[in-house]
């Protein structure tokens, strides 16, 4: 499979994963795991700077999940999660290739 085809396939998978989360069909811990796995899959197919950006956004999502495991999920957490998902979608669109 070519790098460009693989990259598009993985990006579509990330987008689908976010859509499933937003629709309530995927819990936050699974969203975090899926994002981590799919971003790792992109490593040989994408520039390191972009991978670092995606990983940073994933870390923000994972941190919200970890805080939610310890304390009730608050409005600030929800806003941070929404912002991270929005930025992740923008990053995917700009680097679709």
Question: What kind of region is each of these model predictions?
Answer:
Residues 1-97:
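Acidic, Ser/Pro/Thr-rich low-complexity regulatory regions
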